[in-house]
UniProtKB/Swiss-Prot annotation:
It comes from Chlorobium phaeobacteroides (strain BS1). PROSITE patterns: PEPT_TRNA_HYDROL_1. TRNA binds at residues 14, 64, 66, 112. This is Peptidyl-tRNA hydrolase. It is found in: Cytoplasm. It catalyses: an N-acyl-L-alpha-aminoacyl-tRNA + H2O = an N-acyl-L-amino acid + a tRNA + H(+).
């Protein structure tokens, strides 16, 4: 069983913000498999899917971004999923909009959702898919940028990368992180 986690913030006011692109990828995966999200035991929404004979839980923490680790650990414990079988999808303001980067492990890189997951797990060695939300942000306070909505032009670019993110996550499910990295990472990311 694999666990694919898309990070974001709950509440309607956060929909379509840069910070919620992880949620959008999970929604795309649920759409592809024609399933809806249900409330899980641990402050998360999830759906169970099967892809090429492999069981997958797609999950959206219903905590705020900075507390995502609680929902991830709850799901891992409930479904008995080891850390080697999880992929976390999040926004990254250091990657150009329209680019993605997969990694087998690493630091939080300033992403507070990843930071909390690392804190709760006590380790950094879990796979992640970072979705670029743009490097063209004002210096200083990044919170207004990541919590802001995409411009109309940016939204088109974001919408075009979401299916690729879902495909990369499904590649991870079938072939593992190394294969997904080799297939989807690009030099410009």
């Amino acid at each position: 069983m694999k666990l694919i986690v898309g990070l974001g913030n709950p509440e309607k006011r956060h929909e379509n913000t840069r910070h919620n692109i992880g949620f959008e990828v999970i929604d795309e995966m649920a759409r592809l498999f024609q399933t809806g999200m249900t409330t899980g035991k641990g402050n998360f929404h999830h759906a169970k899917i099967t892809h090429r004979g492999k069981g997958v839980i797609v999950l959206k923490p219903m905590t705020y971004m900075n507390l995502s680790g609680h929902a991830v650990v709850a799901a891992m414990n409930f479904y008995k999923i080891p850390v080697e079988e999880i992929l976390v999808i999040c926004d990254d303001l250091n990657i150009p909009l329209g680019s993605i980067r997969l990694r087998a492990k690493g630091s939080a890189g300033g992403q507070n959702g990843l930071k909390h997951i690392i804190q709760c797990l006590g380790r950094e060695d879990f796979a992640r898919l970072r979705v670029g939300i743009g490097r063209d942000h004002p210096s200083g306070s990044y919170s207004s940028f990541v919590l802001g909505k995409f411009s109309e032009e940016e939204r088109k670019t974001a919408d075009s990368i979401i299916p690729e993110c879902a495909e990369a996550a499904l590649d991870f499910v079938v072939h593992g992180i190394e294969h997904a990295m080799n297939r989807f990472n690009r030099k410009n990311a």
